[in-house]
A protein has these predicted regions:
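Flexible, glycine-rich beta-alpha linker
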Residues: 1-16, 38
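C-terminal substrate-binding subdomain of Rossmann-fold SDR/epimerase-dehydratase oxidoreductases
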Residues: 24-167
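Active-site Tyr-X1-5-Lys
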Residues: 1, 19-26
Length: 167
């Protein structure tokens, strides 16, 4: 199981980052439903590394490593903090808080990482701020700098692989 995943290229409906990007690129106000809800926000490449570490551990020791594993960020942060970071990185945008009782979500979603940290020795490389910055940069480079999505994605993969000592 993973925390809330962030990264460029997600255009899903009713999701915080995609909704923010849509509002930023159309100069509309971002509607924020639950500003004080907290989540762990994990860059899209992080759990992939975690899955590879787990697969390597499972090889030959399936019984020991065949249970549930959580891959999450090193900290949790509120929705409003994510919104403010996204606006800071995009540079010009605005938001409005609108209470919506029809859309029911859990207030705090936090994964317990102790087992993963102890037995897999896995931790996220990027902190939440860096994850959000890279995510917003992906969209900014595509929307404002006219870069190809594949080019920005490949740059981010290369950078991550170097940091993770995977290359």
């Amino acid at each position: 199981r993973t925390a809330n995943i962030v990264g460029g290229g997600d255009w899903s409906y009713k999701r915080l980052i995609p909704d923010a990007i849509k509002s930023f690129t159309t100069n509309k106000t971002l509607i924020v439903r639950n500003p004080n809800f907290t989540r762990q926000w994990l860059f899209v490449l992080e759990p992939l590394k975690g899955y590879l570490v787990l697969a390597k551990k499972q090889y030959g020791k399936l019984n020991k490593f065949s249970s549930n594993w959580n891959f999450g960020a090193n900290s949790e942060i509120s929705v409003i903090e994510i919104v403010k970071l996204a606006i800071k990185f995009w540079e010009k945008s605005k938001y409005k808080i609108v209470k919506n009782k029809k859309f029911i979500e859990q207030k705090n979603i936090l994964l317990n990482m102790s087992k993963t940290n102890k037995y897999l020795k896995w931790r996220a490389i990027y902190n939440t701020k860096k994850s959000i910055r890279l995510t917003i940069k992906w969209y900014f480079d595509v929307a404002k700098n006219n870069k190809k999505p594949s080019e920005v994605t490949n740059e981010q993969i290369e950078s991550y692989m170097k940091l993770a000592n995977l290359k």
